[in-house]
C-alpha cells in the first residue's frame, strides 16, 4: 500500500520513526509531520500564517517533509499538494501516550487520522501508553500497527473509516489480546492548581489523578487490563439518539 504517515509529536519523534522504519520494509511510505511538538492540537488548522514545507532526509528509503503547521495541516497539505493521488491509507502515530476515552477529543494524533477520513482516505491512529521514567514500547506498537495493516486489503477499507489503535504499557507476552470496543469516559480527573506570581497574576497549572470510575467494555477499561484496543471512529458528531426529539421540541 501507499501510506501517508504523520503524527503530533513532531517529525523527529521516536514513535513515528520507529513505525516508518518498520512499515517501509513492506509498504511505500511518505512521512509528512509537524516540525515541532504539537500534542493536544486537536483538529486545529493554520489560517492566518503561511505553512512552510521542508524536505527532510531519513535513514530509510522514504520521502519525508516537515510542516510548520498542525497535525491536521500535515494531512491537508500532503493530500492537496505533496501526494494528492496515490495514498491508500493515512496512519497517524505512534503517539507518546494513549488516546482513549475523552482524551480523543484533544488529540492531534487522532485528529490527523480523522482529517484523512474527511478526504475519503481510510485512516488509523496509533498510540502507545507512556509511563513516566520508563522506556516507551514503540516497537511493540509498531508490530501491532503493521499487523492490523496487513489484515486489511484495499477493498476492505471504507473511505470514511478511522481506526483508533492503542497499545498498553507492558511486555508483549503480557498483552492479553485485542478488543474491538467503544470509547470510554475520562482517564484523568483534572483540575488547575493556582499560584500568584510576583506581579500579582494568577498562574494556573493543569494537574490531576487517575479516574478510577471506569465503564466495563470500553477502551479505558481494556487498556487497564492489558488489552490492545481498536475502536472505529467517525467525524460525524450528530447525536442521532435525540435528533427526532430535538426536532419535536423546537419545530413542532
UniProtKB/Swiss-Prot annotation:
Note describing how the cofactor binds: Binds 1 divalent metal cation per subunit.
Q: Which UniProt keywords apply?
A: Cytoplasm, Hydrolase, Metal-binding, Nucleotide-binding
Q: Where in the cell is it found?
A: Cytoplasm
**Main localization of the protein described in the UniProt heading:** cytoplasm
Domain of life (superkingdom): Bacteria
**Ranges annotated as spanning the membrane:** none
**Cofactor(s) the protein needs:** a divalent metal cation
Residue numbers binding a divalent metal cation = 8-9, 39, 95
SS bonds (residue pairs): none
Q: Where does it sit, as one GO cellular component term?
A: cytoplasm
Q: Which family does it belong to?
A: Belongs to the SurE nucleotidase family.
* Function summary: Nucleotidase that shows phosphatase activity on nucleoside 5'-monophosphates.
* Protein name per its UniProtKB record: 5'-nucleotidase SurE
Classification of source organism: Bacteria, Bacillati, Bacillota, Clostridia, Eubacteriales
Gene symbol here is: surE
Amino acid at each position: 500500500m501507499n501510506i501517508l504517515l504523520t503524527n503530533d509529536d513532531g517529525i523527529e519523534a521516536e514513535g513515528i520513526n520507529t513505525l516508518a522504519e518498520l512499515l517501509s520494509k513492506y509498504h511505500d511510505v511518505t512521512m509528512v509531520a509537524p516540525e515541532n511538538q504539537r500534542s493536544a492540537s486537536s483538529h486545529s488548522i493554520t489560517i492566518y500564517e503561511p505553512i512552510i514545507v521542508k524536505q527532510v532526509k531519513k535513514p530509510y528509503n522514504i520521502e519525508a517533509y516537515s510542516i510548520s503547521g498542525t497535525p491536521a495541516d500535515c494531512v491537508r497539505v500532503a493530500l492537496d499538494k505533496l501526494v494528492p493521488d496515490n495514498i491508500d491509507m493515512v496512519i497517524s502515530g505512534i503517539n507518546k501516550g494513549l488516546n482513549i476515552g475523552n482524551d480523543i477529543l484533544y488529540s492531534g494524533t487522532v485528529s490527523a487520522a480523522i482529517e484523512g477520513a474527511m478526504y475519503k482516505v481510510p485512516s488509523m491512529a496509533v498510540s502507545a501508553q507512556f509511563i513516566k521514567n520508563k522506556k516507551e514500547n514503540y516497537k511493540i506498537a509498531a508490530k501491532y500497527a503493521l499487523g492490523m495493516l496487513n489484515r486489511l486489503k484495499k477493498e476492505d477499507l471504507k473511505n470514511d473509516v478511522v481506526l483508533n489503535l492503542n497499545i498498553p504499557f507492558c511486555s508483549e507476552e503480557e498483552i492479553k489480546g485485542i478488543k474491538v470496543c467503544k470509547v470510554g469516559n475520562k482517564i484523568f480527573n483534572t483540575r488547575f492548581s493556582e499560584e500568584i506570581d510576583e506581579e500579582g497574576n494568577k498562574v494556573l497549572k493543569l494537574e490531576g489523578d487517575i479516574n478510577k470510575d471506569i465503564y466495563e467494555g470500553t477502551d479505558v477499561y481494556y487498556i487497564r487490563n492489558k488489552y490492545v484496543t481498536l475502536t472505529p471512529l467517525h467525524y460525524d458528531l450528530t447525536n442521532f439518539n435525540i435528533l427526532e426529539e430535538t426536532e419535536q421540541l423546537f419545530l413542532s
